[in-house]
């Protein structure tokens, strides 16, 4: 019998091992063969019920995949989440693709407030890429929701691939699958050939999308990045760390020794400085709560999972403890919590940002 592959994720179809990759029940397989649409059970559930089952790509598999990309003469399109650059850097990528042209794609640009200029974001992404040892040929901002942005992206890909194949790489949760779906629609008019979802680690095996000249765009599985907030939340609460709508900044006038809780996911302490406004950029649904710095830790312990959510009461058992990162700020600076959002400090201040253990907190020149 010829080998069949899931048209959702590309995994080889098998009917033996329920826990394994590409599993589908025999009855579903027969039905799929009749309709010509063979999905593994995981993709089927994802398509029809938005139900997510977790499958892990081992680090070993991922290294194999990077080797394959690095060994090919292809354009590498590296998709990152503008909202979470740190959480979307692929460790070691520059080492593997040193010989390839890399096009850096900043995704989810529609989430940034309209007041952010594209040129500023592009410049910032290029700076950050250089810090990570990458030398992209160009930076493109895009959004899977925006047709003209996808057209621009395709034009850039055509410009830089010079008749070669294209590999699309990215960590999980950067919106890569949704972007690939938009590209497929742009090229072929076929909607939803690939699974898209919000759970870390969804696309598996590489997907092939034919281009006019006999070349292919290959979509590769997302690697799970350990420093993303997304690992610590259930599917229902993932929405707080992958906003879908334009973020509305909120400014809080704080006195020194005041604290701002970011749901139960993090906290911001204004330790020392003149009274001033701090501007927050988080998902619009995330409830922020102001309190006194004194007793803030006890307040968190008492209210996390209740007044301070997410995490909810069930998730909080597994949720890592918050760890403090102190900063002395001199001028306009963004304090970024990887995968959650950022706080703009407008003047001189001594502050602390608390984030779950293992989640990166970094500073950057204010982007707005």
Predicted regions and their residues:
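Helix-rich effector regions associated with P-loop NTPase G domains
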Residues: 1-4, 8-75, 100-103, 109, ...
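Amphipathic helical hotspot of TIR/SEFIR-family domains
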Residues: 56, 60-63, 85-96
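Short acidic, S/G/P-rich loop/turn micro-motifs used as interaction or catalytic elements
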Residues: 82-86, 110-113
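Conserved ATPase-coupling elements of RecA-like P-loop NTPase cores
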Residues: 87-90, 114-119, 227-230
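A short alpha->loop->secondary-structure connector
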Residues: 94-101, 189
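Canonical P-loop GTPase G-domain recognition
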Residues: 103, 111-174, 185-192, 196-197
